Amino acid sequence: MLEKFERIKLGHFPTPIEHLKNITKYLGGPNIFIKRDDCTGLATGGNKTRKLEFLIPDAIKNKTEIVVTVGAVQSNHARQTAAACTLMGLKCLIILEQRLKNPPDAYMNSGNIFLDKLFGAEIKICPRSEDVEEYTSKVLEDLKSKGTND
């Protein structure tokens, strides 16, 4: 069924499944396994690589100028989207929802948000005081008013 959709290879699949012997033993069974999606390879890995393999070609086909995504400040999805866009030569705008009250500078400048910036994504922070859906709508309206992502 997936064959009818255009797809680009962004990850290393299938990812391994590993038996967690110690946890299985500790629990006295049943056998516990883990799917190692950290091994997908795209921007330190993650399960969102699979959907991006379909979404990015669709964006290219539709001549999308800027891929826009929304997530929390340390969003894995946002990081992987930024990486996929960079690989495919697309601009990426990430709207990050500030969920913490008075987060430390390290939180706002390290981890995934640091990687988002490294991948060249434009970052907009939705303040805690604003509704993220309304904030996103305003950003999208602004893009459209500039003739972007019609």
Regions found by a protein language model. Give the residues of each.
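PLP-dependent amino-acid enzyme catalytic core
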Residues: M1-D150
